[in-house]
């Protein structure tokens, strides 16, 4: 591949920014300064250094985030902070984007990547990738509600939801903690399904997306690359 593309893929900047780095003689390939971005390199076998530091080539990156409330799942927004504002600028330069979306007031697992093919597989309605949410609900969820979820909730606008699983973890006189397993992703779906049962979601967290589980050691707003095991589980999830 071309050296300038390799450097751009490594997050060193746009093609024009990379051109400036080359012109400034800050890039070496196998010990020799290279100023021409058209030079062909093999990132697997050639030693490419930027200011003396070895560059690790990764075409695709995969990041798990524990998304906090108050941040939108978008690449840009004129009113609110986005999830990209919370990650290393190096990933931003690699063109990562959130896979799907969590509402601004929902927190929990969010995957970010620049792998469009994987994102498409995870979001495709045909794949029915299961996502698990935990919700704190104002009101007492009942076994009758669980049966309605299993049958398929009809939303207030007449939209029919696919059958879903509702697990009631605990209840008090006026509140419930539940987990909801969904295989689709309609707008505000969890909140609307609970509302159809006459209750209100007051806190919502996503725990899983397919085989990927939220790392509980991640604080809100923190992120980390996926482990090889996590990545392989996503790649093999059909």
Q: Where are the predicted features?
A:
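Basic, flexible Lys/Arg- and Gly-enriched helix-loop patches that mediate nucleic-acid binding at interfaces
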Residues: 1-238
């Amino acid at each position: 591949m071309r050296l300038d593309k390799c450097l751009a893929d490594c997050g060193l900047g746009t093609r024009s920014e990379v051109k400036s780095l080359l012109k400034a003689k800050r890039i070496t390939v196998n010990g020799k300064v290279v100023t021409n971005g058209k030079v062909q390199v093999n990132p697997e076998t050639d030693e490419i250094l930027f200011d003396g530091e070895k560059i690790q080539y990764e075409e695709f990156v995969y990041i798990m985030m524990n998304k906090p409330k108050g941040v939108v799942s978008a690449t840009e927004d004129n009113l609110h902070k986005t999830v990209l504002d919370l990650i290393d600028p190096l990933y931003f330069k690699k063109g990562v984007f959130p896979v799907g979306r969590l509402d601004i007031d929902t927190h929990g697992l969010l995957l970010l990547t620049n792998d469009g093919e994987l994102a498409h597989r995870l979001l495709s309605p045909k794949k029915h990738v299961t996502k698990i949410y935990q919700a704190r609900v104002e009101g007492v969820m009942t076994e009758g509600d669980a049966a309605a979820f299993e049958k398929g909730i009809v939303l207030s606008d007449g939209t029919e939801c696919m059958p879903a699983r509702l697990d009631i973890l605990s209840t008090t006189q006026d509140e419930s903690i539940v987990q909801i397993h969904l295989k689709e992703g309609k707008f505000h779906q969890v909140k609307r399904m609970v509302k159809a049962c006459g209750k209100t979601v007051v806190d919502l967290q996503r725990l899983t997306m397919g085989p990927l589980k939220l790392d509980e050691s991640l604080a809100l707003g923190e992120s980390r690359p996926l482990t090889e095991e996590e990545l392989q589980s996503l790649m093999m999830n059909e």
